[in-house]
C-alpha cells in the first residue's frame, strides 16, 4: 500500500509498505552530508531506494542530485516523488547497478557520493520474506566493497564519500 509522507523540508515522498521505507539512518546521513556540500557540487546517492536522501538534500547547495537504484519499483517510487515535488530540474533518478556504474556515468563525475548501504552481510541475521526489503537490508545484490569501488570510480579527486556504516562493519573500510 502506498502512502505519501510530508518531510520536514516540506517535500513529499511516496512510500510503499511492501518495500523498504526510510528510517532515521537516512535522515541522519542526509543531515551530515547537507552540512558539507559546497556550492555547485554534483552529488550521487548510491542505492537511493525511494529517493529519500536526494529529497532531503534538495535545499543544499548542490548543483545536481542523482539517485542510483537497482530495484525498478523503487526507481518508480523515487521518480514519482521527484515529479510530485516538481524537482525534475534538480534530481535525476537512474535505474542501474552499483557494480556497473561505469556503464552509466563517466569516471570522476561527482563531487560527493552518499550511501546508506545494506547493513547486514548476506548470511547474517534473519532475512525478511520480502525480496525488496531483504535486498535493502542485506548484501544480496552488492556488498560494501562494491559500494566503495563505485565511489572510487565516481568521485572526482578530493571528492567526499558520506556513508552510514554500523560499527562492526567499519573494519571493511
Language-model features: locations:
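Generic structural signal for residues in well-ordered beta-strands
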Residues: 13, 91-93, 161
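Short loop/edge segments at beta-strand edges and connector loops
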Residues: 15, 95-96, 165
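Conserved Class I SAM-dependent methyltransferase catalytic core
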Residues: 18, 141-173
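Conserved SAM/SAH cofactor-binding pocket of Class I
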Residues: 31-115, 120-123
Amino acid at each position: 500500500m502506498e502512502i505519501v509522507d510530508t518531510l520536514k523540508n516540506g517535500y513529499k515522498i511516496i512510500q510503499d509498505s511492501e518495500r523498504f521505507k526510510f528510517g532515521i539512518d537516512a535522515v541522519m546521513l542526509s543531515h551530515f552530508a547537507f552540512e558539507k556540500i559546497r556550492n555547485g557540487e554534483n552529488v550521487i546517492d548510491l542505492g537511493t531506494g525511494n529517493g529519500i536522501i536526494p529529497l532531503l538534500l534538495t535545499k543544499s547547495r548542490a548543483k545536481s542530485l542523482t539517485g542510483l537504484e537497482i530495484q525498478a519499483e523503487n526507481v518508480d517510487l523515487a521518480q514519482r516523488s521527484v515529479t510530485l515535488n516538481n524537482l525534475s530540474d534538480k534530481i535525476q533518478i537512474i535505474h542501474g547497478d552499483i557494480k556497473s556504474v561505469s556503464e552509466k556515468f563517466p569516471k570522476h563525475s561527482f563531487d560527493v557520493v552518499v550511501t546508506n548501504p545494506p547493513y547486514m552481510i548476506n548470511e547474517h541475521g534473519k532475512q525478511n520474506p520480502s525480496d525488496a526489503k531483504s535486498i535493502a537490508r542485506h548484501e544480496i545484490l552488492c556488498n560494501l566493497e562494491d559500494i566503495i569501488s563505485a565511489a572510487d570510480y565516481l568521485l572526482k579527486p578530493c571528492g567526499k564519500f558520506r556513508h552510514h556504516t554500523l560499527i562492526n562493519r567499519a573494519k571493511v573500510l
